[in-house]
Swiss-Prot record:
The keyword Ion transport does not apply. GO terms for molecular function: structural constituent of ribosome. It comes from the Bacteria. InterPro entries: Ribosomal_bL35, Ribosomal_bL35-like, Ribosomal_bL35_CS, Ribosomal_bL35_sf. GO terms for cellular component: cytosolic large ribosomal subunit. Belongs to the bacterial ribosomal protein bL35 family. The gene is rpmI. GO terms for biological process: translation. This is Large ribosomal subunit protein bL35. Pfam families: Ribosomal_L35p.
């Protein structure tokens, strides 16, 4: 059976922590930032853990991550 291919677009969006969990960026911090508060922009800058419901989809797209 051939190796599974990694979806490169998905591989660029996630990073693995030291404990093996996946982290992702938050949505909403690319443009239209002038009306958002500084606190909101700061909180959007942090990375969050991928939820348990999405973990299956991400691991299918990036099997070797």
């Amino acid at each position: 059976m051939p190796k599974m291919k990694t979806r490169q677009s998905a591989a660029k969006r996630y990073e693995v922590t030291g404990s093996g969990k996946l982290r992702r960026r938050r949505a909403g911090k690319n443009h239209l930032l002038q009306h958002k508060s500084a606190a909101r922009k700061r909180s959007l800058s942090t990375k969050v853990e991928v939820s348990e419901t999405d973990l299956y989809k991400v691991t299918r797209q990036c099997p070797y991550l």
